[in-house]
Amino acid sequence: MKKSVLSIVVFIGMTCITIAQSPNKMLAISMQTLKDKIAGGWAGKMIGVTYGAPTEFNYLQRINNDSIKWTPADIKGSVWQDDIYVQLTFLMAMDKYGMEAPAVKYQEMLAKAGYQLWCANMQARKNYFDGIYPPMSGNPAYNYRADDIDFQIEADYIGFMNPGMIQNIINECDKIGHIMNYGDGIYGGIFLSALYSAAFFENDIQKVIETGLSSIPAESDYARIVRDVMKLHRHYPTDWKAAWQELDAKWGDVDISGAGSAFNIDAKLNGAFIVMGLLYGDLDDYKTLEITTRCGADSDCNPSNALAVIGVIKGFSNLPPEMQKGVKDVGDSVFINTTYSFNTAVEATYNYAL
């Protein structure tokens, strides 16, 4: 993964990283802030996935109006979640083979990992043992789950280690995403990674989403559904449920994996629910979690991504104290079948970002 122009500069005792987005645009971030925001992203993943876990796929094409029970102690369950352990395997592949390693090395480590996989990831594992490698392992000809949510929920690390470097994100997602996905399934990973990348420097959630949109093809269905959510938010600025109803009426039946049923693990609809949570959540941690979860479908993955965006924007040190404590309490717990804990993942991601 070749980095854009990046340098470390010392200003009056404060070490900063400067990033050249273009010949005429430079971005700067202190190394302390960079690490805090990376930690906020990983923490958001852990908090969000455990917040929504009891509701996952229990609310299909219907809003969740039931009570949601969560405590910071629940964060300990994040070590069992594929939203996190798959991408930590990809970090392990980088550690072992280097940042420029070919995609098949990542696929090999994914295939041989001891944890359970589902959907597009499970097919990518089977494809490896059948001798089908990237990019064909994610092609619909060999993986009918190619539009599923898999890469979208495990591309976070790419955004975390590429602050302000959208082209790096596109290049890396194109390589890794084709292990298990194709088309909108890859665009979801690019879009989410670009949200994180923008969130290092931008607090306006509308602008963060616009940056994400600019990173994927405008004519793609993924871009279309995100634009629809933004339009619905403008039309119903205080009524997310009305926006949800119109969104579901148009896009609720797009998942080939759930054809003929209400089941939907499609990347773009679940991505739209992430955007809905971000827009209507108003940068409030709990409000963002609640709305994203109540949208239903893959309702542990979606709040996990949504709060990770908030975590990067705010930084770990600005998350609610009880959330910080819940993460710190399990900070050294190792995610299953990986070598990484929260603390070591933050450190490694930070080092790769430099």
What are the residue ranges of the model-derived segments?
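Bacterial Sec-dependent N-terminal signal peptides
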Residues: 1-24
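Active-site-adjacent bridging/hinge elements
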Residues: 22, 55-70, 122-136, 161-172, ...
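Accessory "access/gating" subregions that flank catalytic or transport cores
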Residues: 29, 138-146, 162-165, 174-178, ...
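Mature N-terminal segment immediately following signal peptide/propeptide cleavage
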Residues: 29-52
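Mature, well-folded catalytic/scaffold domains that follow N-terminal targeting or propeptide regions
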Residues: 38-39, 89, 134-138, 144-152, ...
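Active-site-surrounding "flap" and adjacent substrate/cofactor-binding loops of secreted or lumenal enzymes
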Residues: 53-88, 103-118
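Extracytoplasmic mature domains of secreted/periplasmic and thylakoid-lumen proteins
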Residues: 98-154, 158-163
